[in-house]
Structure formats: structure tokens, C-alpha cells
Curated annotation (Swiss-Prot):
GO terms for biological process: L-histidine biosynthetic process. Gene3D superfamilies: 3.40.50.880. IGPS catalyzes the conversion of PRFAR and glutamine to IGP, AICAR and glutamate. The HisH subunit catalyzes the hydrolysis of glutamine to glutamate and ammonia as part of the synthesis of IGP and AICAR. The resulting ammonia molecule is channeled to the active site of HisF. This is Imidazole glycerol phosphate synthase subunit HisH. GO terms for cellular component: cytoplasm. Coiled coil: none annotated. The active site is at 78 (nucleophile), 179, 181. Its EC number is 4.3.2.10, 3.5.1.2. One of its GO terms (molecular function) is imidazoleglycerol-phosphate synthase activity. It catalyses: 5-[(5-phospho-1-deoxy-D-ribulos-1-ylimino)methylamino]-1-(5-phospho-beta-D-ribosyl)imidazole-4-carboxamide + L-glutamine = D-erythro-1-(imidazol-4-yl)glycerol 3-phosphate + 5-amino-1-(5-phospho-beta-D-ribosyl)imidazole-4-carboxamide + L-glutamate + H(+); L-glutamine + H2O = L-glutamate + NH4(+). The keyword ATP-binding does not apply.
Length: 200
């Protein structure tokens, strides 16, 4: 069985992500320091809340540099995905820098509420095994007020007052802006794909 490390970055969704993994038959172990990453074959970085506090917690745990140097597949979920990018406007904080781009505050407009909350459709941008088995017009559940830009690494986007990255992959680094643990079959499929797919 795959050894899955689930990083405790202080996000309230840690337990629900762990439960979602249990439903897939995966008993992930919670990691709170660099030593906990040893032997992991997959690493999951969930998170909700604010980027500055999450980065501060990762620094306190001594996890920033080990995550930057990680040589196994990593997926960030919700705030965890945003932390993979270079910088966040939220608190003007430097993030892990594993993916190019700056996470910016979403702009409210007529009919566009921020935070973006609820179900929204994924817009495939390029092929990736992360999306294998998903139906056309698959939807996922989002809760966020900041968003990463669409880049060459974007696998799927979402439109809420403009396109933003919903699923991302660059080599071993992956991310999902939505909550897989709250996204029914879509979320379960993407988690399973991450756990089972072959990486370059």
C-alpha cells in the first residue's frame, strides 16, 4: 500500500481529507515535522484559512525547505494549492515557490460574490492523468477568496468573474483549489488519480 503523508498545516479540513482518504482505503499518517516525510510515497498538503498563518506554521514545523526539496508526488488542496505558488497577496506572503505565479484576491462584481462558495464547473485546459475518468462538465465544491492565475501548468480552470486555476500539475507538484473531500465523485476520483497515477 502507498505510504501517504498528510501534512497538518493547521487547516480545519485535515480530518475531512483524512476521512475522504479512508473511504478510498488509504490510512494516511498525519505529519507535523520533516522527519514525518521520511518514507512517504505521496504527500498531501491540505489547508483552509489564511496564507500567512499557514506558511508560519510550516516554517515553525521545519517543513518549508523539505517540501521545496521533495522528490515524491505532492498535492496541495484549497489553501494548500495556493501555498505551492510563489507569492500570495493575502498578507503579502512568500509561499513555497514550487509553481510559478502569484495568488491574487478575487474581484467581486455584479453577480460575482467573493468568497467564491459552492459548486462550479471544471474547464479542462490540457490532458493530465489527474482528470482521468471524470465526466464532461464535472463540477467541484469551492470555498475561497484568493485564486491562482491560469498558467501553462493549469490542468483545469474554473470561471468565477474570470478564469482561475482549479487543478494544476507541474511534474510531481499537483494542486486542487476546490475541496476534493466535499466534491462527491469528482473529488474522490481526483484523489484516487493522484494516489494511483504514474509520474514522470
Amino acid at each position: 500500500m502507498t505510504d501517504v503523508a498528510l501534512i497538518d498545516a493547521g487547516g480545519a479540513n485535515l480530518g475531512s481529507v483524512r476521512y475522504a482518504l479512508e473511504r478510498l482505503g488509504v490510512d494516511a499518517r498525519v505529519v507535523r515535522d520533516a522527519a514525518g516525510l521520511h518514507g512517504a510515497q505521496r504527500v498531501i498538503l491540505p489547508g483552509v484559512g489564511a496564507a500567512p498563518e499557514a506558511m508560519s506554521r510550516l516554517r515553525t514545523q521545519g517543513l518549508v525547505e523539505p517540501l521545496r526539496a521533495l522528490q515524491v508526488p505532492l498535492i496541495g488542496i484549497c489553501l494548500g494549492m495556493q501555498l505551492l505558488f510563489e507569492h500570495s497577496e493575502e498578507g503579502d506572503v512568500e509561499c513555497l515557490g514550487l509553481l510559478p505565479g502569484i495568488v491574487r484576491h478575487m474581484t467581486p462584481a455584479l453577480g460575482i460574490r467573493v468568497p467564491h462558495m459552492g459548486w462550479n464547473q471544471l474547464v479542462p485546459m490540457r490532458e493530465s492523468a489527474l482528470l482521468a475518468g471524470l465526466p464532461e462538465r464535472a463540477s467541484a465544491y469551492f470555498v475561497h477568496g484568493y485564486a491562482a492565475p491560469v498558467t501553462a501548468d493549469t490542468v483545469a480552470a474554473c470561471d468565477h468573474g474570470g478564469l482561475f486555476t482549479a487543478v494544476v500539475q507541474n511534474g510531481l507538484r499537483c494542486g486542487a483549489q476546490f475541496h476534493p473531500e466535499r466534491s462527491a465523485d469528482t473529488g474522490a476520483r481526483i484523489l484516487r488519480n493522484f494516489l494511483e497515477m504514474s509520474f514522470p
